[in-house]
């Protein structure tokens, strides 16, 4: 959890702030919560189930969903239902800086934080937006693609196969030596 976060006065009077205000009270509350949430990070890209928003703002599920939808419509953030990841578009710029020099040690910290994020569809757009500003070096792609149920597991290397067969033969022969003559295993 962060110790502090920066909120610009532009939140209330900037173009996005005005959009949020016209979208309603829930949108403003959700937007402010997303910037100051104890679950947030400096990137503005983090895990945020809607239930957290509902509970911690007191808006309830309906109010939180409405506020989040309106904040998205206002261009404040994006939300992925499947991964429950939110991206507050300008948060990294406000929390970190507009631009960092390549030798700034924060660049490594930002890259590490980015690398540690779970797979989600905001990874590539985040990198594209902040690559130059924060000297990011490694772009991640959403890797939530799983193998098709039709696909068979990959075949082991020949040496692995031989080792497994030898191990099975050894276990089977030692188990047989312990059994009395004429004993038939039924399980």
Where do the PLM segments sit?
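A generic alpha-helix surface/boundary motif
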Residues: 10-11, 47-48, 181
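Winged helix-turn-helix DNA-binding recognition segment
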Residues: 17-25, 36-95, 100
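Long, low-complexity, charged/polar intrinsically disordered regions in eukaryotic proteins
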Residues: 1-13
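Charged low-complexity intrinsically disordered patches
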Residues: 3, 62, 97-187
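Short, flexible active-site loops
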Residues: 14-15, 52, 179-182
């Amino acid at each position: 959890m962060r110790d502090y976060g920066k909120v610009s006065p532009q939140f209330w009077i900037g173009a996005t702030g005005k959009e949020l205000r016209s979208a309603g009270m829930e949108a403003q509350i959700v937007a402010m919560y997303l910037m100051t949430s104890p679950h947030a990070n400096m990137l503005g890209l983090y895990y945020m189930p809607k239930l957290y928003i509902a509970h911690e703002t007191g808006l309830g599920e309906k109010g939180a969903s409405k506020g989040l939808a309106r904040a998205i419509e206002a261009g404040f953030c994006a939300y992925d239902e499947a991964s429950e990841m939110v991206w507050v578009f300008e948060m990294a710029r406000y929390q970190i800086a507009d631009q960092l020099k390549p030798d700034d040690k924060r660049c490594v910290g930002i890259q590490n934080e980015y690398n540690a994020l779970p797979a989600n569809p905001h990874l590539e757009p985040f990198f594209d937006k902040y690559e130059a500003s924060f000297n990011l070096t490694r772009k991640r792609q959403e890797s939530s693609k799983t193998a098709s149920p039709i696909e068979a597991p990959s075949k082991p290397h020949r040496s692995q196969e031989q080792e497994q067969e030898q191990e099975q033969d050894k276990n089977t022969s030692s188990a047989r030596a312990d059994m009395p003559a004429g004993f038939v295993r039924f399980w």
